[in-house]
């Protein structure tokens, strides 16, 4: 038998009942859930050096556990010295078990390793129940070996939920122990 991800089990047992009581849902299917987590790494330096892109792909593969898709420039921009079709980044979409395992590692291991971390910005919700955040250094992930990296790159993390409002999404992510800052603290 395949073992279920720890956070998925926690969601099914505890989070669903807590959310049903708090928001008075009539059905279990109304309870918001995390649909996907998207990781995006923009690699502007890849324009000058193609090896940088390969290192970014390796890092993203180690962080996410699956091979990323290379994103290409949609149009040429002379100011950035890029042409249409050139690789400028990579992204990964995590769903199901891998998504819950990544979220578990993010909350319990990675975020506590971020330098001067005081919590995530509660204003980063988009109005429709999705949360976006950025990590400035990929080396905070335990999968990345600091001595073997070619440079420090950041990445964006988008958590897409089925919540209709920011309040529901915030309650859902707080139930998963995502460390959001208090509004009164700066």
Swiss-Prot record:
It comes from Legionella pneumophila subsp. pneumophila (strain Philadelphia 1 / ATCC 33152 / DSM 7513). The keyword Cell membrane does not apply. SUPFAM superfamilies: RL5-like (SSF55282). Pfam families: Ribosomal_L5, Ribosomal_L5_C. The keyword Lipid metabolism does not apply. This is one of the proteins that bind and probably mediate the attachment of the 5S RNA into the large ribosomal subunit, where it forms part of the central protuberance. In the 70S ribosome it contacts protein S13 of the 30S subunit (bridge B1b), connecting the 2 subunits; this bridge is implicated in subunit movement. Contacts the P site tRNA; the 5S rRNA and some of its associated proteins might help stabilize positioning of ribosome-bound tRNAs. This is Large ribosomal subunit protein uL5. Signal peptide: none annotated.
């Amino acid at each position: 038998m395949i073992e279920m991800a720890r956070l998925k089990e926690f969601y099914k047992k505890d989070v669903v009942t807590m959310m049903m009581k708090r928001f008075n849902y009539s059905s279990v299917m109304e309870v918001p859930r995390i649909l996907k987590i998207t990781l995006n790494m923009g690699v502007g330096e890849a324009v000058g050096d193609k090896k940088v892109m390969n290192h970014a792909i390796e890092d993203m593969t180690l962080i996410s556990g699956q091979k990323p898709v290379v994103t290409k420039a949609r149009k040429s921009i002379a100011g950035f010295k890029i042409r249409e079709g050139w690789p400028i980044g990579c992204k990964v979409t995590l769903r199901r078990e891998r998504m819950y395992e990544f979220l578990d590692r993010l909350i319990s291991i990675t975020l506590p390793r971020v330098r001067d971390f005081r919590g995530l910005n509660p204003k980063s919700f988009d109005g429709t129940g999705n949360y976006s955040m950025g990590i400035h250094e990929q080396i905070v992930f335990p999968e990345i070996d600091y001595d073997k990296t070619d440079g420090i790159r950041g990445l964006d993390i988008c958590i897409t939920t089925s919540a209709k409002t920011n309040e529901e999404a915030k309650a859902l992510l707080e139930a998963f122990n995502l460390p959001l800052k208090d509004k009164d603290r700066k």
